[in-house]
Amino acid sequence: VPGQTAGVSVFTDDLISTTGLTRLQLAIAYLVGTGTSGLLLGAGGRAIDRHGSRVVAFAATVGLAATLLGLSVIGPMSTPVGLVVMSIGFGCLRFSGQGLLTLASRNMVAQWFDRRRGLVTAVSSAVASFALAASPALLLVLIDIDGFRTAWQIMALALVVVVGSIIITFYRVSPEAAGIEIDGRGRTAIPDEPEPGTSAPERTVLIIGTEHDATRAQALRDVRFWALTIPVAALSSTATAITFHIVDLGAELGLTDDEIVRIFVPIAFVSVPITLLTGWITDRVTPLFVAMAMTLAQLVMYPTIGLLDTRWGAVAAVITWGAAQGCFSALTSAAIPKVFGRRYLGAISGAQMSAMVIGSAIGPAFFALVQSITGGYRAALWLSMLLPAIALLLSIAGLRHDQHGDRRAHACR
């Protein structure tokens, strides 16, 4: 939560008043920091392939806790110094939290399941959705108790003690590394560590996936990768921007802070059953259908966010945001290993996560820029519809690609 936008947005006004930066300047720092972290996530994905999710997730947890402690002691700064400090702070926060810890956790789950991967990742994401939905209101309560500094310090302690313990206790690299086959179908000859006293030729080389799995370069040249990635990158960008400016957006619409942050809870209630449904669907058909559904939901969601002050607008925005969010898990956790395999899962998922994080970096700054020009956020919401429209066309192209491949495979038989 601390590295996600929902965990940052409630601290925005405190950061503005403490550092002396304007809202646009803080958004620019968020853009620079988050964009930089997105560029580094490709290396993070390769590190997961090399060292495993357990090591990377624990390192990310410690890094996130250290970042929160550092941010908790900031004070008034000149504009140039403030921009540099907050860019570094946001970069570390987003790289360790939203980026590396999330990527390592998703990959760990995806490595362990095949037959019901979509459903398992959906259940995991449903729990995370409720946590993220509840976090803004809970963090506001924590801030009200003793200020934003203490809130961040408490979260840093909880990360090391609670999350760190969970990672050490439960995270494992892959079924192959644990000496079993995926889905628990049987045993293999591959142990966690080589047996003492065995010679080099006797040691089995750990192989994950199959020789048919796509490399990162092959995936990036495949239209299906972009059909699966652009919808989640678009939602990351726009949803991050909305969440980052949620208090200011509420003021524009005549809503109080408490009224505007309450929309996240019904969004979670909508997204959870759809998350489970799309996970079930992904286990049975191509995830490109889920990508198409996500783009259609976004095309309705974005303009209706600007109508949250009306009853029908609020209902439409909550339903479509929940629907789009409900497709997220299927495309980020289950779709990549299903389409491209597990051998280079870290590298390919890292590329997808990079696009998402870079999108989430651009969104808040873009919305702040449009707001400074037009005096409101509605124009930014309408302009944000361009990416989902492009993604819809790519999804259709991806379906044609799959159909062509099926016909070719049938002809070979």
Per-region residue spans from a language model:
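Intracellular juxtamembrane helix-capping segments at the cytosolic ends
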Residues: G97-F113, C327-F340
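Interfacial helix-cap and linker-helix signal at transmembrane-aqueous boundaries
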Residues: L15-I16, A47-I48, L138-D146, G250-A251, ...
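C-terminal ends and interior cores of transmembrane alpha-helices
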Residues: V62-T79, A297-D309
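Symmetry-related core transmembrane helices of the 12-TM Major Facilitator Superfamily/SLC fold
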Residues: W152-T169, A380-A397
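Extracytoplasmic gate region of multi-pass secondary transporters
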Residues: Q4, V8-T12, A217-T275
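C-terminal transmembrane helical hairpin of 12-TM major facilitator-type secondary transporters
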Residues: A239, L255, E259, F264-A335
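Helix-to-loop junctions at the C-terminal end of transmembrane segments
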Residues: L40-S53, I274-T286
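Hydrophobic core of transmembrane alpha-helices in multi-pass small-molecule transporters
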Residues: V81-L100, A233, G313-C327
